[in-house]
Amino acid sequence: MTLEDINHPHKGQPVLEKGRRPEDAAAAVILLHGRGASAESILSLERSLRDTVRSDLAWLAPQANYHTWYPYHFIQPEEKNEPSLTSALKIVEELLERLSAAGIPREKTVIAGFSQGACLSLEYAGRNPGRYGGVLALSGGLIGETVDDAKYQGSMEETPVFLGCSDFDPHIPEDRVHESAEVFERLGADVTKKIYEGLGHTINKDELNYFRAMIEAL
């Protein structure tokens, strides 16, 4: 095992693809799976939307090393989740660079995730603000023991940002969802926040409708 293997544990993991090749697509969606899940499982979102969204999309779903983007709960001290967290953020950056090289800019790319993947989606966009096609966080929030505003500086340039979560989720404190939405509002994103009564840790049809609308607006 090399030092790079230790510092970048997600390097070399597969990226599953659906839809058009990036070189042939007009827009893209990056899908980030949750803890214990897989790239294949998060691609079920593509299957759910396939017949009702535009067909000129590239869908990319990276696989986390050992099915986990970072080892501890997302509201643990950030250093406990290193180096896995930095490695996971780097994977998102590398996918965006790959899409850009294929002719798909960030403003034509949606970053979407569920659970750990939702947290990662928000954390990447918050640390790297700019105009994206959209950011969709299903059951997630910004990462860290507290929300450190100093990490999130710049402008989201009215990027659509959707946060959806249950009013009681055993993994996601509702307060963190509200705090995360406030950060993105401060950064100038077009924020939609939905708290669903009794939803639990899952995805509902209303969230899929928001996802569909975000994609269609690309």
Q: Where are the regions that the model predicts?
A:
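Short alpha-helix in the alpha/beta-hydrolase fold that links the catalytic acid
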Residues: 43-47, 148-149, 173-183
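Flexible "cap/lid" loop of the alpha/beta hydrolase fold
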Residues: 71-77, 140-160
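Short beta-strand immediately N-terminal to the catalytic nucleophile in serine-hydrolase-like folds
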Residues: 111-113, 138, 164
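A conserved short beta-strand
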Residues: 130-143
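Short beta-strand/loop motif that positions the catalytic acidic residue
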Residues: 162-165, 169
